[in-house]
Swiss-Prot record:
Compartment list: Cytoplasm
Primary location recorded for the protein, binned into one broad class: cytoplasm
Any Gene Ontology CC annotation: cytoplasm
Record's protein name: UPF0291 protein LCA_1274
InterPro entries: DUF896
Family, per entry: Belongs to the UPF0291 family.
Disulfide topology: none
One Pfam family from the record: DUF896
HAMAP family in UniProt: UPF0291
């Protein structure tokens, strides 16, 4: 988590510098690499949260999408 915050802080620092005075080519590359890494981690975390999700209707019947159920079965998270 601390690494994510450091990465995010550096992305923001480079964004402020880009608006204020511009970035060197090296800083532009660094910013893009940091953004790509951050987005990769974010997407992975989000996917994990969605894969753990179970959806129920008002009557209490599970209505989790089949695609999510299949992924949960593959990962051993579901017995049915």
């Amino acid at each position: 988590m601390a690494m994510d915050q450091k990465r995010l802080d550096r992305i923001n620092e480079l964004a402020h510098k880009a608006k204020a005075e511009g970035l060197t080519p090296e800083e532009t590359m660094e910013r893009q690499e940091l953004r790509d890494a951050y987005l990769k981690d974010f997407r992975s975390s989000f996917r994990s949260q969605v894969e753990m999700l179970q959806v129920y209707d008002k009557e209490g019947k599970e209505v989790t999408p089949e695609k999510v159920k299949d992924i949960q079965r593959e990962k051993g998270l579901r017995d049915d």
